Every structure is written in C-alpha cells, then in structure tokens.
C-alpha cells in the first residue's frame, strides 16, 4: 500500500522547473548540466532540500495517522505460526515403540534470514508404535459386498485415495462351496452326477429351495477341467437330490496334481434364498453307461476293442485278459457292469505229421486208415481278479461268472452281462507298460486241455461296454470347502458322517457398512495417533461412527479422540491401545483388527450428501507448529520503577506466561485466593520449607481498567518487550536479590513456515529409536507480522464496526481481522451453507490465501471464525446454529475456439499470449478487467471472455467459440450447464483451453 501524497513533485521535477524559469529571471545565465557552474550546483542543492521537504510534508498525514492509532493503543498483529503434521518412522523389525514428548523440535530443510534451519515443535505427546497398517477392507452386510481398499505385506506402499465406504473395485464376497473327491467325479464322456443334500434334524428343504438350485440365476454348478471350471448346462432336482448332467462332448474332469481330487463347485448368487438352510451331510453319486474300455490286453499284446479273442485263438490254462478303464474301475463301492457280445469260433488244432501213427503198407485195409477221435477244447472256468496294491485278489467271493466263457449255454452269439461292487481297496496295476485301474479274467480250467486232435472252441468278444452307478452306494465328500466372507471352512468325511451340522451360506456380520483396518502388530500403549488426510471438508455433520477392536471376548468399543469429526475433515484419531488385542483371521488375513462401523447405516441408505474422500492415512503422526518453546527465562528487577520495560531474549512472541516472585509480599488471604484461581506456584526446599512463591500475572490490552493492586502487564509480541504500569493503574513488580520475574513463552511464526511436503526431515536431537521424520502434508497458515498499511485499514474498519457484526461488511471485515489467512470473504444473509434460502441464516464464504496448494488451511480458518465471531454477533444466530462458514466452489472454465491468424509463424506466439491472457483474466484473485479478481458469485460472461480474446495482437478472426464449465464431482471434474447450477458461492478459474489455429487465405 502506498501512502497518500499531497505533493507528488520529485527532485527531477524541481530541477526541470528551475531550468524552465531561469531564462526569465536570469537571461544571462544558462544551466549547463554537462559543465556545471556554481549556479547549477546551487540548483541541485536546492532541489535536494526541497524534495526532502516535500517528502516530510507528504509523510505528515501518515505520521498523524500513526499518532492517532497509537493513542487508541492500536498495534500490529503478530506473526502467525504455520501448522502441519509430522510422521515418525521406526527402523524395520523394531519390536518396541518410542515415546516422543511434546515440544520435540524438528528441523526443516528451509533456512530463515539468519541462515538457520526453521524449527518446528510437536504440539502433543505421541507414542510411535512399531505396528504397521497393512490391510483395509470395507464390507456391507445388506449389500453382501467386500471390497479391498489397501493391502501390503513387507514395504509400506502409498494409499490410493478412496471414498469412505465406497464400493470400489471387485466385490470379493463369494458364497460357494467346493466338493472334493478322488474318484467319484471322474467322468470322461457323458454321465450323470447326483448330489443329495441331507438337512439337519431341525431343518427341511422345501421344493422351492430345491428348484432354486436349478436356476442358474441363483446357483451355478461347475466342475474343474484342465482349462478351469466349466459350468453344467443341465441341472435338475428330484426330492433332495440335484442331478447334474454332463454331455459327451464336454471336457473331462481334471484332477490337480497337488490336491489329487476332482472338484465340483457350487457358486451361490442369490444368498437370501438359502440363508436359513442347514445341512449335516452331502452325499455324492455318479452314473454313466456304455463306456468302452481304455485298453484290453491279452497275450502280452493290446487287442482291437471292436472284436478280439480274449485268450487268443488257442487258449490254455492261466491265460489272462485285462480290461482297463481308469474312469470305471476306480469307482470304489459303485455298482459296475460289463456287457459284451460273445461268440465262439471253431479253430482246428495244428497237428504235427510225425504224431500220426498210421502203419503204412503196400496193401492196406480200410480199418488201417482210421484216425484218432477229434475233441472240442473249451474253457470251463475262469477267475475274475483285481489288484489291491499288494497282489491280485478275487473279484467275487463265490463262483459268480466263472463259466461266462463256457459253451454250456450254446455256441451261438450271446449278450453277456456281469455286475459287481467295485472293491474299496482296488489300486492301479502295472500291465506291460501301462499302469491303470483294471480287472482281469484268468483261465482256471479247460475241457480237453491236453487233446491233440480236434478244435479250439475259442471265445470271440465284441462290443464291450462298461457302466457304473452309485445308486444305493452314495459317498460322502472327502473334503468340503465352504467359502463365505472371504473365509474358508473345511469339513472332511469324518465330520460329515458324524452329522456335524453346518449352514449352507454365511452372511456378513451386521447390516451396515464396516471399515476394517488390519495391523501386523497390536497397536497398544499410547497415545497412538493416526492422521486421516481428507481431500475436502464436509459442510454438514457426518453420521456417527463407532470404533471397535478385536479381543478374546469379541469386538469391544474403542475409546478414541476423533478430531476428524467422523471424517468430516482432516484430523488425527488418537487412542491408547489396550493389551487385550488379539489376532483374528478376517478376509484371509491374520491381523490385529480395528473396525469402524456406520452404526446407523446412513451411508448404506445414501442419505449423506457428502462422501468423504480419504487421500492418505498416516500412523505415528502428530501436529506440529512453527514455534519454539522457552520455559523459565528469568528477568531481574534492580529497582521498582514506573512503566518498567523488560526485553525478552526472543521476538515474535506467540503465547506467554509471566510469573513474579512475591514471597515476602503476600498475605495468607491472598495466598488462599490465588491458590483457588490456580495462579500460585509454591517452591519448597528438600526440608519442606517454602523457598519462593510465584504469582502468575495477567496480560491485558491496556491499563485503563487496572488499579494499584492489579497484577497486569502488556506485551509487545513483535519486539518481545514486557511493559508494566505505574503502581496506580497496575502494580509494579517487586525487586529482589535474585531474578524476580520468570517468563514461559513460545516464539516464532511467519510465512516462511509454509512448507511443501517432505520438507521437514530432521530431528533437532535424537529421540529414542526414531529413524525417520517427514511432513506428509503441507504446512499452512503461517503469516508474517502485519504491515503498517494493513494495520491502518484494519484499525480504521474497527472504528466503524466496533467489533460488532451488524452489516454484511462488518462480518467480512471482522472475519479478516480474526484470521489473516483470508484472501476473499463475502457474507450472505438468508442463505445457508448450501446456498439455499434459510431465514435468519448468516453464511460467510471464505477463500484462504493458499487455496490452490493446501486444503487444510480452510479447516483452521473455520475453527478460528467459529471461535471468534460469536463474541461479536447476535447470540440468537449462534444459539440457533444459523452461522455458517464455507468455502467457494470453483467453476473451471474451458474455452474451445477457432483462431485465424495471418501467418503460420505467428501461431506459437499468439497461442502463448492467448493462454496467458485467459489465465490472468480468469484468475480469482488478480483477474478481471481491473486486476482486482472476481467477487464470490460473479462468473465471467461470454462477451467478457470474447473481449479479452479479441484484444490479442495478431488475431485476424475468431470463429466458433464454445465455453464449457466444469465443477468438482465425486469422481473428478464433471461438465455442467451454467444456466442450471447455483453459482452464488462460485469463483471462476482457468482450465485447459482447446484453441484450433488456421491461416487466413490470401
């Protein structure tokens, strides 16, 4: 601010005037500045003296103004310290925490005018815990959702900003169970799987529930293949049994090597249908028909499965035939059937001519030519066997199917069928180079086995088909895994066969939103502090949240000091962790858990207008301030005198306490009164004898209301000087043989304390095991000592409003005086903080100085105004809760225009000039035509913007021009129509402009 000038002439103006009139008064003399003579020197001397006189004359108004305000005891407002947050780090693998006391000093990377690092101090005690925040989840029982917000194992990773209780990313909640069995489910081709649900004794399964299982909108059944789970397309139900049909062209079941189980998965989509269903077992069965054997081996060679001799063309005792099928013969306890077409071929025995005993003669009789009798060699008895892991055992305990290859039933084609229950101890057998599940038939008895003349009645088999069916022999799962709420519960066949009841589905605890915080160690002891850094401050009161932690007795309420006001604003959450914290597995993570419940389910019902966005969470974080604490500075009074002044060692005093030693000047009644008012500090010796009595004196703004006994003083905070009175309007401190005045105070502050993130990284002195420090947010709110011109304006306004809020201007000026971090403020009457009509309401729309770089400063301003303004305004407005303090919303303006220029070489320069001009014009602080910025609620019009654009030199023509408007939405900037939104609390700002250039045609 420049002082008012009565006479604006300068030294140069005076010299020019003398030079001009000298020709009229002394025509014989000419002023020569290049070769000055005595006259020229005299002119310069005169001009210096005259300019100095004008300067003093012009300053007389300011001097008189200063004298006037001095008479009113006006003063410059002191420096304001910057505030912020600091995060302490401990070494990795640290087992114990560290206590960091209040007033711990930290050094910034920035230096002050004296070349010293700026010093900050912690404002509260904090216990730096070795616990780390490793996981965050949000769940909702009503919506049946689980979302992961954050997860880290080793190194702490930055937290991605998220909205409180927002369903972001994939819903991790799944309701499904997987049935494991090593052989029942193995189906390669077409087949049928039966799953029978066995309800608990107190439960019945209705037809509606069973039918719900068959609807893929409710439940999806799938089975594991080599490409993953493949759904069944055909699901039916009969009574309590679900029938899953597998088509022949479908992929075969696949067994994972590590688990050695075939799997069927049931994914439940509509949970509410099955919420009350409890089971005690699940029985399994499969059925398949007309399965061809995988391999048939006879006589050490693999046979053609379409038609073959099971024992060769010339069977003999102990010949064997092997039927192999991994699918069929590992179905332990299932009913297995084998069907085949059996025919017999008559194959002559190959005879050796040397064995013919004919007595040849020259002349022979007819009887001499008679040959031996021919015999039919047939199979009378076979034995069916299976491999049990140690050797081959009988498949049938009796003579069943021993005569299956006998010709007793005729030699014409027959369809044979044999059935048996697959043994439970059947194992794979190694036959030639193939290891598989198989059975074999071995010849035990052959009729006419040793005859050498005749025919082999050899069996011929074709169309071999295998079948299996578990009907009546259902199996329990070897393992049943239930997946609910990201938890896994396992039941083995023993559990299931012992009728252990279990619910089919388990829903989340509670019907509201719950936010879970998982720590790798128990965050115990304290005070532990955690910073919740929010993107913005909510205008309204937020829904109540309940903090809990997990113990042996379950969830317990947690006593926290929540400075965020239920995440309405950025702040610290403080607690002292109890030692009954225990680990719990939630969401497949074994952690020490804290949870935050939306107890009224307000977020779930979408009743909140504002959803907090949390940008960061920092554990082991506390408040800091750009001040230094000085305790017990002693001052000596040599001789009590009127208007005594004493200087402190430091300037820019913020907070101060003055104690005076009045050991010999107090009566008993005064001691009692001062003790009651907590203004007395008595120091005792080791023997219990009073050594000194210190009395706390009070700071006042002036001595006009003080009397001779008033223990009052004044403080010049900017200079660090104490002022005492004359003994009539305020007491005089007594003298003593030692120092009689003790001062505790803090000093510092200033705009230099406003630092960027990570600019504070050192401790002034080591503290415990603290290894790192850093400021996770910008420090804010620091102001220098008020300059004299701002003081003139403020004090002049004070004379107008007298610290009483009556008019809108009064509210605005008093707000600026209460908080010097305000760059713009506008008062609205009859409107609430949302810009809506409300009778009797007063709303102050405040723009902080650092609005572009720091959101936290507004919260500080808001607190100061709510603390200061009620003393200056109608108590009814405050009592009815109709005083609102909010900040303006920014309307980002983006311009799309077609610009025509003369030459391509002009494009770069004009584009830069145009962007700069728009940036300057739309600046909310220094924009507009008058460079005084835009008033709150004033938005530039289309014509005003066009006027600025047309003023750029070099533009030939401006074609199609469109102005787009954007505001901050929940998920970023969103475009709005300027005609359909309430702009009463808005300020413009420049966005990114889309300027398309072209060259004017010749």
Where are each of the predicted segments found?
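Short flexible coil/turn linkers enriched for glycine and charged/polar residues
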Residues: 79-80, 378, 524, 652, ...
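Feature for intrinsically disordered/low-complexity regulatory segments and propeptides
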Residues: 44-48, 59-73, 80, 86-89, ...
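Extended assembly-interface regions of large multimeric machines
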Residues: 1-652, 659, 664
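Surface-exposed interaction regions enriched in Ser/Thr/Asp/Glu
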Residues: 267-274, 433-454, 587-610, 690-772, ...
